[in-house]
Swiss-Prot record:
Predominant localisation class: membrane
Region of interest (Disordered), residue spans: 17-105
Name of the protein in its database record: Uncharacterized lipoprotein SAOUHSC_02650
Lipid-acceptor residues (N-palmitoyl cysteine): 18
Keyword set, alphabetical order: Cell membrane, Lipoprotein, Membrane, Palmitate, Signal
Biased composition (Basic and acidic residues): 23-70
Organism: Staphylococcus aureus (strain NCTC 8325 / PS 47)
Start-end of Low complexity biased regions: 71-105
């Protein structure tokens, strides 16, 4: 009987020991599983953070590329605008020059004598030189005539009438010589010169024909 009790007691202790080992093994396996899950979760978290960082870096690169492209577009637009402005300025200058040339051509008046002109200036200063060469140096005929008429009217009658013109040459420099008749004084003329600079000067306000 004692042996039976002793055997049962030994069996109970053995089974209890086996059960404890099994529980410890289960606890160990559970800890391993928990650790593996934790490491896997940490890895996922790290991977997610890395992906976010990579995406952020990619976004920065895209934004930088967009800024660079925008800057290039703005620079190209600025260069294009500057080129267009320069071209417009050139066209405007050409247009102004063409307009000035057209005005000069349209306002050009060939030298002429007054109505029923007496040979006054031509007699005082007969010109036998190269007329075309002289006219190239002298100012526009009508402009010179108007300046001479205004100067002549400063002396005596202020309504003098254009009579005739001639050209005077001295050391390669030319002058217009104009005569203006005084309607209030029979046979009297004002003699006015205009040089190549356009300067008018009365040389004789009461020339008697």
């Amino acid at each position: 009987m004692k042996r039976l009790v002793t055997g049962l007691l030994a069996l109970s202790l053995f089974l209890a020991a086996c059960g404890q080992d099994s529980d410890q093994q289960k606890d160990g396996n559970k800890e391993k599983d928990d650790k593996a899950k934790t490491e896997q979760q940490d890895k996922k978290t790290n991977d997610s953070s890395k992906d976010k960082k990579d995406n952020k870096d990619d976004s920065k690169d895209v934004n930088k590329d967009n800024k660079d492209n925008s800057a290039n577009d703005n620079q190209q637009q600025s260069n294009s605008n500057a080129t267009n402005n320069d071209q417009n300025q050139t066209n405007n200058n050409q247009s102004s020059n063409n307009q000035a040339n057209n005005n000069q051509k349209s306002s050009y008046v060939a030298p002429y004598y007054g109505q029923n002109a007496a040979p006054v200036a031509r007699q005082i200063y007969p010109f036998n030189g190269n007329k075309n060469q002289a006219l190239q140096q002298l100012p526009n005929f009508q402009t010179a005539l108007n300046a001479a008429n205004n100067e002549a009217n400063k002396f005596g009658s202020n309504n003098k009438v254009y009579n005739d013109y001639s050209i005077e040459e001295h050391n390669g420099n030319y002058k217009y010589v104009f005569s203006f008749k005084d309607p209030n004084a029979n046979g009297k003329y004002s003699i006015v010169t205009v040089d190549y600079t356009g300067q008018a000067m009365v040389t004789d306000p009461n020339y008697q024909q």
